[in-house]
């Protein structure tokens, strides 16, 4: 199995090439939407991921599947993925798409805020988190990636880059426990 660093090194030039294509055709947001959809599809469908990652499956079979899945997508994106199959780089598809989205966020001055909460956040709560992150980062936009972790008991943990804001009840209990053990 290859390391995350090696995957990133292989994926970065392809992600930059994809962004270059998207910018030249004014399709950066459309590619971003398609990349998110494809990443969600790969995350939800282990069979699809196994099919794409399997080196013993013929390239023509992979190409046929890509053409079928991306029939509604931009032909530029579809051809890019077909090129990845030809170059035997389709194994790095997820990392390439994640790198593309990171480059797109950078281009749009958007930050990714990973929000973990005890229960699913309402639209109002998500908007409040976005406003808080905007105030902290001075970015133009915020993209939220939310997940639920019932172990938090209540509250949220917000991660933006290397900065973590822990306002969860679990975090507060941990800090209280540390203070009590130090006194």
Curated annotation (Swiss-Prot):
Return the similarity comment: Belongs to the ATPase delta chain family.
User: Could you list the residue ranges forming a coiled coil in this record?
Assistant: none
Q: How does it assemble?
A: F-type ATPases have 2 components, F(1) - the catalytic core - and F(0) - the membrane proton channel. F(1) has five subunits: alpha(3), beta(3), gamma(1), delta(1), epsilon(1). CF(0) has four main subunits: a(1), b(1), b'(1) and c(10-14). The alpha and beta chains form an alternating ring which encloses part of the gamma chain. F(1) is attached to F(0) by a central stalk formed by the gamma and epsilon chains, while a peripheral stalk is formed by the delta, b and b' chains.
Q: Which UniProt keywords apply?
A: ATP synthesis, CF(1), Hydrogen ion transport, Ion transport, Membrane, Thylakoid, Transport
Query: By its UniProt entry, which Pfam families does this protein fall under?
Result: OSCP
A single GO cellular-component term on record: proton-transporting ATP synthase complex
Gene name of the encoded protein:
atpH
* Membrane-spanning parts: none
Q: Which HAMAP family match?
A: ATP_synth_delta_bact
Membrane topology of the entry: Peripheral membrane protein
Please classify the protein's predominant subcellular localization into one broad category: membrane
Name of the protein: ATP synthase subunit delta
Q: List the Gene Ontology MF annotations in alphabetical order.
A: proton-transporting ATP synthase activity, rotational mechanism
What job does the chain carry out? F(1)F(0) ATP synthase produces ATP from ADP in the presence of a proton or sodium gradient. F-type ATPases consist of two structural domains, F(1) containing the extramembraneous catalytic core and F(0) containing the membrane proton channel, linked together by a central stalk and a peripheral stalk. During catalysis, ATP synthesis in the catalytic domain of F(1) is coupled via a rotary mechanism of the central stalk subunits to proton translocation. This protein is part of the stalk that links CF(0) to CF(1). It either transmits conformational changes from CF(0) to CF(1) or is implicated in proton conduction.
Indicate where this protein resides in the cell: Cellular thylakoid membrane
